[in-house]
Regions:
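Metal-dependent phosphoester/phosphodiester hydrolase catalytic core
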Residues: 1-279
Length: 279
C-alpha cells in the first residue's frame, strides 16, 4: 500500500499581509478557488507550516515587524489554524508546530517564525523558543520510527545568503543541540526539510559520529528570483537549481536489507526527474 502526503514548507499562499485579516482571508480564498489546488487537496492529504511571507512579511519573525511595527502573533496563529487542516491544530500551543505519524514516517513540522525571541537573538533558544525546543526534544526522545522528517520554514545550513535570517545568525548553539538529539537516534534515519531561499538545493551535514545528515530545501515553485543556486562553499552541496525552475521535491521510503532507506527526487513540471539522491 502506498501512502502519499504533501508537505508545504512556507510562503505557500499569503504574501506579506501583515496584521490584516481581510487580506489574509482574500489570499486564501483565491487559493481555494483554484481548480488545480482543489483537485490536489481533495486527493492528497496536505499539511503546511509558514515562513516569513505567509507569517507577516519579508524576513519578519517573532513580535517585531518592519519599522518596529508590532506583529500580532496570536491573531496570525488563529488565522493560520483557520486555513490549514494541520494535525494537532486544536491543541492549546504557543506556536503552529505539530507532529504526525504517516505510515513508517514520523513527521515533525517546526514553527521557525512566530516563536523567535527578537531581544535574545544570538542566544540559546532564541530561534524556536524554549517551549518548542523542549517539545522537540521530548518528541524525538520518544519516537520509535525508522524514518523521521523535521521541517522548518527557513534553512538549517548557512551556505546561502550568509544565513541572514536563519539559524546561523540566530541560534547556532540551539541548532547544534538539535543535531545532537538527532545523533542519538541511532535506529532512525532523520532528514531535514526547509524552504525560504528561492530555488532548490541539497546539502550534506557531516556529523562527529561519522553519519551524515541531509537537508533538502525546495523553493522552485515561486515566481520570484532568488540568490545564486550554489553557495560560495560548494563542498557539501549536492545540487542547486535556480528559482522559477518549476520543480517540486519527492521523498520515498522503504527498508533495504532491513535498514531504513530514503530516496529524494527533484521533479520538474514535465515530470522529468532532474535530481535523484539516495540517502
Amino acid at each position: 500500500m502506498c501512502i502519499r502526503d504533501r508537505f508545504l514548507i512556507g510562503d505557500s499562499a499569503v504574501d506579506g499581509r501583515k496584521n490584516d485579516p481581510g487580506l489574509i482571508k482574500t489570499d486564501y480564498m483565491l487559493r481555494n478557488l483554484s481548480p488545480p489546488v482543489q483537485q490536489l487537496t481533495a486527493n492528497v492529504p496536505t499539511s503546511a507550516t509558514w515562513d516569513d511571507h505567509d507569517y507577516w512579511g519579508d524576513d519578519v519573525s517573532g513580535t517585531v515587524g518592519h519599522r518596529n511595527r508590532t506583529v500580532e502573533v496570536e491573531l496570525l496563529r488563529k488565522m493560520w489554524k483557520m486555513q490549514w487542516n494541520n494535525p494537532q491544530r486544536d491543541l492549546d500551543r504557543a506556536g503552529i508546530y505539530f507532529e504526525a505519524q504517516i505510515g513508517p514516517v514520523h513527521y515533525i513540522a517546526l514553527d521557525t517564525r512566530s516563536c523567535r525571541l527578537n531581544d535574545k537573538r544570538g542566544e540559546l533558544n532564541s530561534f524556536l523558543g524554549p517551549q518548542q525546543m523542549n517539545w522537540l526534544k521530548e518528541t524525538l526522545e520518544v519516537s520509535t520510527s525508522q524514518f523521521i522528517l523535521i521541517s522548518g520554514g527557513t534553512m538549517w545550513t548557512d551556505y546561502i545568503s550568509k544565513a541572514k535570517d536563519t539559524w546561523g545568525t540566530w541560534d547556532i548553539e540551539g541548532r547544534e543541540t538539535i543535531f545532537g538529539w538527532i545523533d542519538a537516534k541511532k535506529d532512525s534515519q532523520v532528514l531535514l526539510l526547509s524552504g525560504d531561499r528561492h530555488g532548490a538545493r541539497g546539502f550534506k551535514i557531516p556529523r562527529p559520529n561519522g553519519k551524515t545528515l541531509y537537508e533538502f530545501e525546495i523553493g522552485t515553485l515561486g515566481g520570484c528570483p532568488g540568490p545564486d543556486p550554489f553557495g560560495e562553499d560548494r563542498s557539501q552541496q549536492l545540487f542547486g537549481l535556480e528559482s522559477r525552475s518549476w520543480a517540486f521535491g519527492e521523498l520515498t521510503f522503504k527498508l533495504r536489507n532491513g535498514k531504513p532507506d530514503a530516496t529524494f527526487r527533484l521533479i520538474d513540471a514535465s515530470g522529468k526527474v532532474v535530481q535523484r539522491i539516495l540517502t
